[in-house]
UniProtKB/Swiss-Prot annotation:
It comes from Homo sapiens. Binds phospholipids; exhibits strong binding to phosphatidic acid and weak binding to phosphatidylinositol 3-phosphate. Stabilizes GTP-bound RAB7A on late endosomes/lysosomes and alters functional properties of late endocytic compartments via its interaction with RAB7A. Binds 25-hydroxycholesterol and cholesterol. Its main location: other. The gene is OSBPL1A. Residues 1-237 are annotated as: Interaction with RAB7A. This is Oxysterol-binding protein-related protein 1. It is found in: Late endosome. Residues 430-463, 877-913 form a coiled coil. Interacts (via FFAT motif) with VAPA and VAPB. Interacts with the GTP-bound form of RAB7A. Interacts with OAS1B. Interacts (via FFAT motif) with MOSPD2 (via MSP domain). Pfam families: Ank_2, Oxysterol_BP.
């Protein structure tokens, strides 16, 4: 492009140099100069304006005419969203407005301030002219809509209805027929459905007092019109200035917008145009408006949550009255209420839907007729072959032909009825699908809006500043996400705390501690034939920043979460069976418990093991792969003194069973887990159903418990983070001792973030010991009286701090409500039971894996020849993801899921039940709960008749 020529064109257009403009346009037409006739200025005097904008604004008619003749875009927008028509109307240049209209300038385009050309002009004559042109253009669109409906041109009809300013869907021709009338009497089914979905009223009558139903041609069209009585007409956006009452600020002027059943308010009109800086919103589901007779401008809206919002129409508002607002609010409230509370079909809709029994009966009748026809034809052919065509045979021959002919007619009639019955439902079912999609859209948008605003509110509360908009979720964790609170104990080495490691070397605890650290550092211990464990994965994880879990979940509203197929990018390269194996990372605590003689100290170690079992989940927001039915996993760790086998024993519901045992026969650890998922809108909660059992064989003791609830926050907006909460009750079934641990929810300002507290009690509920710490860091034990005294004093200090904050507004604004980095205060006399090992330096690039998790999917040729073909390590999609081959992992995951579905269908056809190989269902021997018990014989290595699942 010749920028110099463009600058000259802009300059001459601004100054009205018609001859120079004409010469430039001629050279451009001859291709002697390559320049854009719609170029935009870059200097201060013409920034973002085209030559046509400048000529219209400064009133140079000849220049405008030459530019339009040369092909300048008549509806081109400048940087403020104005068209040349906006500029000509604003400056009151009637002759230029008429010229632009001759070249089909669009009068309905809205600029950046939300105004059309007629709304920016100050000349009444120009406004009247633009209104007349607008009516003419609108009528042309209506005629095109009527023609498209008559001729069945669905594509053109859809394009017209999807315009920014669509024609009136209930417009009429000279006979009073609406587009729906036209589609009905021409039997254009798809056009009728589109019109109904766009708000066409099926109850309007033409000049002959006929509804569309009266003109409908064909049973299908009549059924569509009868079955769509509950359609709500398409809502138009309604907006304008309103005063809004506030408890703290009194009456403030906002630009208020009604759209899709939502009332939103903004500080300025341009903010509403671009949908930015929204100050608040309310969904109008079941909203009720009230007015005061003493004030013609005031009205109130009572929302579904019983909140009341007061609004006042500005007294100088000429175009909008209180009645206009009330009517618009009523329409949007009805729309939102309809789609947000339509839980079940009405009686009329139930009648429109043919039952499965009727469809089956119709099909069976058709099949019976078909079978009769086959028999008659066979007999007929046989008779022909045996017939010598004697005269005496002719009457019987003709009679048989009539029978066959009659059977054929009956078959055709039956099949036609059957086909009509099925096709009759198509329109109704398509419409119901559209309704559900619209309902889904409304609900998902409402949920996303609430979550986003709640997120902004909590962020503003944490930062101590007033919210930029009203209401969303757990934002202070974004501030915490980069903190090192989970590693704070590494800075507490100088604290004098009595620990099992310091006082119990004779119990062998140091030996187990050293063996664990040796393993994490890549030692030489043998495990499944691997001499030296890897310290990283073959490929780092892919960034998930460009992907949104909400974009997937919003399409799955109403589905069971366990059945939702997530893209592989949200996974981590481990099966859920391998994730379960991470319970064993701190096995030294079990060995330690087995070696202790005091039952209370044993309970302390078991409690520490139960807490440590969930520690690896911190920052592990990747989803493990769902195990396939029959999938197994084994792990042998000579260095840690255990071996484990697990199997996916059920697919729906998904249940994983595991069994681990000490290599020195000192313990057995087993259980079955069914992660029951719940979607709470802003978070996904996983409640691990199932009993965990630990048996200390040397003491003939058994402990049972269930894991806490795990919750992933900020599904819709913000950074994902994980929380564990709920009570965990560990029972010693021999002594009757009980340990009750409370995994605390974080609270609004994170004071209880990751905290775990509880007591060990005897069977008479006497407190024997207190436990406290964080599931991400450590666990301590202390005398219960000392702990209670500390808690009482801590509560008192907290209240004093709260009061002091309330006294100083400036302090409140400056203070960040984030927990102290050294967040576990060690009470004097405490005993350290467990402390988490630091994660490897490359953990953040390796799905936040611990050193223990890093080796779970490791495999070599020697191991491959030993493990069964159902082992997770041989699963191709997990292996591909571990190697960084995301596309292949996705393809393999899809292939395995389809293979699993096909196998399930084959079993259902053959009425064959699935049989688990290594576990069987039965009651837990200690609490009687339903459980999966290890059947034995896995370690004999006789792997015959294993299913082909990969």
């Amino acid at each position: 492009m010749n920028t110099e020529a463009e600058q000259q064109l802009l300059h001459h257009a601004r100054n009205g140099n018609a001859e120079e403009v004409r010469q430039l346009l001629e050279t451009m037409a001859r291709n002697e100069v390559i320049a854009d006739i719609n170029c935009k200025g870059r200097s201060k005097s013409n920034l973002g304006w085209t030559p046509l904008h400048l000529a219209c604004y400064f009133g140079h008619r000849q220049v405008v005419q030459d530019l339009l003749k040369a092909g300048a875009e008549v509806n081109v927008l400048n940087d403020m969203g104005d068209t040349p028509l906006h500029r000509a109307a604003f400056t009151g240049r009637k002759e230029l407005v008429m010229l632009l209209l001759e070249y089909n300038a669009d009068t309905t385009i809205v600029n950046g301030s939300g105004q059309t050309a007629k709304e920016v002009t100050h000349a009444e004559e120009i406004r009247s002219m633009l209104e007349a042109v607008e009516r003419t253009q609108q009528r042309k669109l209506e005629e095109l809509l009527l023609a498209a409906a008559r001729e069945g041109k669905t594509t053109e009809l859809t394009a017209l209805l999807n315009r920014p300013n669509p024609p009136d869907v209930n417009c009429s021709d000279q006979l009073g027929n609406t587009p729906l009338h036209c589609a009905a009497y021409r039997a254009h089914k798809q056009c009728a459905l589109k019109l109904l979905r766009s708000g066409a009223d099926p109850n309007l009558k033409n000049k002959n007092d006929q509804k569309p139903l009266d003109l409908a041609q064909g049973a299908e069209m009549k059924h569509i019109l009868v079955g769509n009585k509950v359609i709500y007409k398409a809502l138009k956006r309604y907006e304008g200035p309103l005063w809004k009452s506030s408890r703290f600020f009194g009456w403030r002027l906002f630009w208020v917008v009604l759209e899709h059943g939502v009332l939103s308010w903004y500080r300025k009109q341009p903010d509403a145009v671009h949908n930015i800086y929204r100050q608040g919103c309310k969904h109008l589901t079941q909203a009720v408006c009230t007015v005061k007779s003493t004030d013609s401008c005031l009205f109130f809206i009572k929302c579904f949550d019983d909140t009341i919002h007061g609004f006042r129409v500005p007294k100088n508002s000429l175009q909008q009255s209180r009645e206009d607002w009330l009517e618009a609010i009523e329409e949007h409230s009805a729309y939102s209420t309809h789609y947000c509370s339509q839980d079940q079909l009405t009686d009329e809709e139930e009648e429109d839907t043919v039952s499965a029994a009727d469809l089956k009966k119709s099909l069976e009748k058709a099949q019976s007729c078909q079978q009769r026809l086959d028999r008659e034809i066979s007999n007929f052919l046989k008779m022909i072959k045996e017939c010598d065509m004697a005269k005496e045979m002719l009457p019987s021959f003709l009679q048989k032909v009539e029978v066959v002919s009659e059977a054929s007619r009956e078959t055709c009639v039956a099949l036609t009825d059957c086909l009509n019955l099925f096709t009759k439902q198509e329109g109704v079912r398509n419409f119901k699908l559209e309704q559900e999609q619209e309902k889904n859209k409304i609900l998902s948008e409402a949920l996303e809006t609430l979550a986003t605003e709640h997120h902004e509110l909590e962020q503003s509360l944490v930062k101590g500043s007033p919210p930029a908009s009203i209401l969303s979720e757990d934002e202070f964790y974004d501030a915490l996400s980069d903190s090192e609170s989970e590693r704070s104990l590494s800075r507490l080495e100088a604290v004098t705390a009595r620990s099992f490691e310091e006082e119990g070397e004779h119990l062998g605890s140091r030996k187990h501690r050293m063996s664990e650290e040796k393993d994490c550092g890549g030692g030489d211990a043998l495990s499944n034939g691997i001499k030296k464990h890897r310290t990283s994965l073959p490929s780092p994880m892919f960034s998930r920043n460009d992907f949104s879990i909400w974009s997937i979940l919003r399409k799955c509203i109403g589905m069971e979460l366990s059945k939702i197929t997530m893209p592989v990018i949200f996974n981590e390269p481990l099966s859920f069976l391998q994730r379960l194996t991470e319970y064993m990372e701190h096995t030294y605590l079990i060995h330690k418990a087995s070696s202790l003689s005091d039952p209370v100290e044993r309970m302390q170690c078991v409690a520490a093991f139960a807490v440590s079992a969930v520690a690896s989940q911190w920052e592990r927001t990747g989803k493990p792969f769902n195990p396939l039915l029959g999938e197994t996993y084994e792990l042998v760790r000579d260095d840690l003194g255990f071996r484990l086998i697990s199997e996916q024993v059920s697919h729906h519901p998904p249940i994983s069973a595991f069994h681990a045992e000490g290599l020195n026969n000192d313990f057995i650890f087993h259980g079955s887990i069914y992660p029951k998922l719940k979607f709470w809108g802003k978070s996904v909660e996983a409640e691990p159903k199932g009993t965990i059992t630990l048996e200390l064989l040397e003491h003939n003791e058994a402990y049972t418990w269930t894991n806490p609830t795990c919750c992933v926050h900020n599904i819709i907006v913000g950074k994902l983070w994980i929380e564990q909460y709920g009570n965990v009750e560990i029972i010693n079934h021999k002594t009757g001792d009980k340990c009750v641990l409370n995994f605390k929810p974080c609270g609004l300002f994170g004071k209880e973030l990751h905290k775990v507290e509880g007591y060990i009690q005897d069977k008479s509920k006497k407190k024997l010991c207190a436990l406290y710490g964080k599931w991400t860091e450590c666990l301590y034990s202390v005398d219960p009286a000392t702990f209670d005294a500390y808690k009482k004093n801590d509560k008192k200090n907290t209240e004093e701090k709260k009061n002091s904050k309330q006294m100083s507004t400036s302090e409140e604004l400056d203070e960040m409500p984030v927990p102290d980095s050294e967040s576990v205060f060690i009470i004097p006399g405490s005993v350290l039971l467990w402390r988490i090992a630091p994660r490897p330096p490359n953990s953040a690039q390796m799905y936040n894996f611990t050193s223990f998790a890093m080796v779970l999917n490791e495999v070599d040729k020697d191991m491959e020849s030993v493990i069964p073909k159902t082992d997770c390590r041989l699963r191709p999609d997990i292996r591909a993801m571990e190697n960084g081959e995301i596309d292949q992992a996705s393809e393999e995951k899809k292939r395995l899921e389809e293979k699993q579905r096909a196998a399930r269908k084959n079993r259902s056809k053959s009425e064959e039940d699935w049989k688990t190989r290594w576990f069987h269902q039965g009651p837990n021997p200690y609490n009687g709960a339903q459980d999966w018990i290890y059947s034995g014989s896995y370690w004999d290595r006789n792997y015959f008749n294993l299913p082909d699942i990969y």
